[in-house]
Structure formats: structure tokens, C-alpha cells
From Swiss-Prot:
GO biological process: base-excision repair, AP site formation via deaminated base removal
Annotated EC: 3.2.2.27
Gene Ontology, cellular component aspect: cytoplasm
Function: Excises uracil residues from the DNA which can arise as a result of misincorporation of dUMP residues by DNA polymerase or due to deamination of cytosine.
Species, as recorded: Blochmanniella floridana
Main localization (coarse): cytoplasm
Catalytic site: D63 (proton acceptor)
EC class: hydrolase
Gene it is expressed from: ung
Record GO terms (molecular function): uracil DNA N-glycosylase activity
PANTHER family: URACIL-DNA GLYCOSYLASE
SUPFAM superfamilies attached to this UniProt entry: Uracil-DNA glycosylase-like
Protein name: Uracil-DNA glycosylase
InterPro entries (alphabetical): UDG_fam1, Ura-DNA_Glyclase_AS, Uracil-DNA_glycosylase-like, Uracil-DNA_glycosylase-like_sf
Length: 221
């Protein structure tokens, strides 16, 4: 088998009927005047920002933020200049208590995590403006489940952070004998107090990586 890259996986999937159908639906919606997030050039940013062999940590989100210009292809992240969404505020709150010296940044762009080896994957990669989960059933999860399966099969000793019920449904794809899985509630204001705040997933991730003789993640942004 040739060296596995995201380009190879995408080139295989893009020719399959389900994948073509996703973009047929997106193009139809755009023609009808609907606004789709993220911008088309940003949909696959998670694959551009973190090479397959560089991944150490996988954080699984649900679908992109559906507000104006919030989504840019990385789960939980927003571009510079966009106000922090509530879930991201809670992520920073947990980091402040979990990681000594962490200073809450004034922006919500998590791209530097991507460069550290943190794969910020939404299971649904697009959304209609103002309509959460509007693209939940157009086929994206067939693709992102394949991505998770590929990581599970061809990598080992990854840390999977599964926050909330939706992410936790992906645990059946992940072999917990090969990988380290950490589970807690979603960081949204509705559920953060039921486990996320105080979970210490960031320090636990680094402890695991250090025990595997891997470089730890610099969570400071």
C-alpha cells in the first residue's frame, strides 16, 4: 500500500456516488440562494492543516458553527476577529484551570493546535446559515466515519477526545486497545457543568503522549 495521505483518501472518496451527491446538494442549495458555511475553499481545512502522519490527538465536533463567517473548517474554532462562541469560552475556561500558565487568548482560532498535531474534525463538514445540523443527513458522516476508521486502522496511540453524545457515538469505530479515548460532556453551556469543566482532558492528553515518548501538545494559542 502506498504511503497514506489525506490527498490519497480524498481522491478515492471523491469519485464515489455518495460523495458526489453531497456536492450536488450543496450546489443546488447555493443556486437557490442559501448561504452555506464554511466557504467552499475552507471545507477541507482540517486535512490541509494536519498531515495524516502528524496527528496525535483527535477532537470530534458535530457540525460547523452556523453564524456569519464563524466556521472555517476546524471543529470548535473561529477565525481571528470573530467573537468567541460559548463552547469555545468553556474550552478556554477548562484550559485555564487544567494547564498551568495557560493564558486565555483574545481570539478563537485553533489553527496552531492543528500544527501541533491536533485534528479538529467535525463529523458534518457544512451547514446552512442559521440552521444547526441542517446538513446532518446529506452524507458527510459516511465520509468522516471513513476518516476516523482510517485513523483507527493505520495509526496507533492516538488520543481521541469525545465530548458529548454525538462524538461518543463514534467510539464504536475506535479500538481502545490501540488508542486512548477520553470521554466527557460537551463544552456547550447546557452541558459543560456535567463533566467537561474539570475533566482535565488537556493535561491527561499530554500525560499519555509523554508516556508514549511523544512530544506533548502546546495548548497555548
Amino acid at each position: 500500500m502506498p504511503k497514506l495521505t489525506w490527498q490519497l483518501l480524498l481522491s478515492q472518496e471523491k469519485n464515489l456516488p455518495y460523495f458526489k451527491n453531497i456536492f450536488t446538494i450543496l450546489n443546488q442549495q447555493k443556486k437557490s440562494g442559501k448561504i452555506i458555511y464554511p466557504k467552499q475553499n475552507d471545507i477541507f481545512n482540517v486535512f490541509r492543516f494536519t498531515a495524516f502522519e502528524s496527528i496525535k490527538v483527535v477532537i470530534i465536533g458535530q457540525d460547523p458553527y452556523h453564524g456569519y463567517n464563524q466556521a472555517h473548517g476546524l471543529a470548535f474554532s473561529v477565525p481571528h476577529g470573530i467573537p468567541l462562541p460559548p463552547s469555545l469560552k468553556n474550552i478556554y475556561k477548562e484550559l485555564e484551570t487544567d494547564i498551568p500558565g495557560f493564558i486565555k487568548p483574545q481570539h478563537g482560532c485553533l489553527s496552531s493546535w492543528s500544527k501541533e498535531g491536533v485534528f479538529l474534525l467535525n463529523s458534518i463538514l457544512t451547514v446552512e446559515q442559521g440552521k444547526s445540523r441542517s446538513h446532518a443527513h446529506i452524507g458527510w458522516e459516511l465520509f468522516t466515519d471513513k476518516v476516523i476508521h482510517t485513523l483507527n486502522t493505520y495509526r496507533q496511540n492516538l488520543v481521541f477526545l469525545l465530548w458529548g453524545k454525538h462524538a461518543q457515538q463514534k467510539s464504536h469505530i475506535i479500538n481502545n486497545q490501540k488508542h486512548h479515548i477520553l470521554i466527557t460532556s460537551h463544552p456547550s453551556p447546557i452541558s459543560a457543568k456535567y463533566g467537561f469543566l474539570g475533566c482535565k482532558h488537556f493535561s491527561k492528553t499530554n500525560t499519555f503522549l509523554a508516556n508514549q515518548n511523544q512530544h506533548i501538545i502546546n495548548w497555548q494559542l
